[in-house]
From Swiss-Prot:
This is Sprouty-related, EVH1 domain-containing protein 1. The lineage of its organism: Eukaryota, Metazoa, Chordata, Craniata, Vertebrata. Transmembrane segments: none annotated. PROSITE patterns: KBD (PS51488), SPR (PS51227), WH1 (PS50229). It comes from the Eukaryota. Palmitoylated by ZDHHC17/HIP14. Ubiquitinated.
Length: 406
């Protein structure tokens, strides 16, 4: 079931305890006596000559190298975050669970699952590395360059591109009926009108790098409304076209000359290539680098600028004010009541203050909360205090701050 994995095809790699569902007791038990396992979310080649890809969750116990988890991801996956360190998911009638060592590992695994499902839904090409292939529009480009070009508009934010990373160039073969002009960029006449953005990414940044602000999670109760299938925010469009001459390349670039036939090669030292790039994003990245030092946050695993780090910048960092509001307003009583009275067979229940009209227990839940507020009047203070806290986050007075690792 698992193919030969490439390091670049890994979405997440964490250590966790693999759990199994016990239908008799309605709970979760450690699989095979427990023990930490190395769990990886990756893209692998399907066995046989089909040449397709599949997205796999693979778990191997560390102490004896036994494979304890082998799960092929599908589009009908339902992912639940029960606690900050315990997540489980269901594919058809099969259920899988993981207990993580820390909330940071759980968040990294969650982001890896979302990225894998996103790529599965979009339908990535079967191979992203190797020799050149012919695209549907006619031009022949290198597979590695085609992968970074095709998927940048769909899955990656261009503001995370390092400016010091050199751009990879791709030379597109012109039609033998077109005139060869070294002062122009060659674009096939069947290429769509929408320009293709051509950028490159660092290998380690492709594994798990999602801005946590794309999916706002206030606390672990939000797992009851799965949004792993939600698309990212609207992608920014390329703003301009820049022509540059690459003169310091160590390898010569070759163009097919129509004058000497399709099989002849013509070497040119200075080659002008049409590069489409978002200048605003590059300037923004360059400005960030000049502003101050960047570090990785221990809570959200994202890189941040020390000079721009303030309250409310990290959604995963501990927030003492929010914790105080939660305790003062006795929200623990509300969640306990919902867990014992309105949870399903999995032990899941809706967020106490959710107004989702699709919830069949919406009216009953709010009626129970109003009744409970007569016993604990301090619950009425939660919504006003939470609104004030949100205003404080917008002003930079409240919220969690990034903390540098190490």
């Amino acid at each position: 079931m698992s193919g030969e994995q490439e390091p670049d095809d890994s979405y997440a790699r964490v250590r966790a305890v693999v759990m199994t569902r016990d239908d008799s007791s309605g709970g979760w038990l450690q699989l095979g006596g427990g023990g930490l396992s190395s769990v990886t979310v990756s893209k692998t080649l399907q066995p046989g000559d089909s040449g397709g890809t599949e997205f796999l969750v693979h778990g191997e116990r560390l102490r004896d190298k036994t494979v304890v988890l082998e799960c092929v991801l599908r589009r009908d996956l339902v992912y639940n975050k029960v606690t900050p360190t315990f997540h489980h998911w269901r594919i058809g009638d099969k259920k899988f669970g993981l207990t993580f060592q820390s909330p940071a590992d759980a968040r990294a695994f969650d982001r890896g699952i979302r990225r894998a499902i996103e790529d599965l839904s979009q339908g990535l090409p079967a191979s992203c590395h190797g020799e050149s292939e012919t695209s549907e529009d006619g031009p022949q480009v290198n597979k590695e360059d085609h992968y970074s070009t095709h998927n940048n508009d769909h899955f990656f934010r261009s503001d995370s591109i390092p400016t010091e990373e050199l751009y990879r160039t791709s030379v597109i073969r012109p039609s033998p009926f077109e005139n060869l002009n070294p002062r122009r960029a060659y674009i096939h006449n069947q290429v769509p009108l929408k320009p293709i953005r051509h950028v490159s990414f660092q290998d380690e940044d492709e594994i798990v790098r999602i801005n946590p602000r794309d999916m706002i999670i206030r606390r672990y109760a939000d797992y009851r409304h799965p949004d792993i299938f939600r698309n990212d925010v609207d992608r920014e469009e390329p703003e301009d076209v820049t022509f540059f001459t690459k003169t310091d390349s160590k390898k010569p670039s070759y163009l097919y000359s129509p004058a000497n036939g399709r099989d002849s090669l013509k070497e040119q030292k200075p080659v002008e290539v049409c590069k489409i790039q978002p200048t605003s994003s590059l300037k923004k990245s360059k400005g960030k680098k000049e502003d101050g030092e960047h570090s990785s946050c221990v809570y959200c695993q994202e890189r941040f600028n020390h000079e721009e780090n303030g309250r409310g910048k990290c959604q995963d960092a501990p927030d003492p004010i929010q914790r105080c509001i939660y305790q003062v307003s006795c929200m623990l009583c509300a969640e306990s009541m919902l867990y014992h009275c309105m949870s399903d067979s999995e032990g899941d229940y809706s967020d106490p203050c959710s107004c989702d009209a699709s919830d069949e227990n919406l009216c009953l839940r709010w009626l129970a909360l109003i009744t409970l507020s007569f016993i604990a009047p301090c619950m009425c203070c939660y919504l006003p205090l939470r609104a004030c806290h949100h205003c404080g986050e917008m002003c930079g007075c409240c919220g969690g701050k990034h903390k540098a690792a190490g």
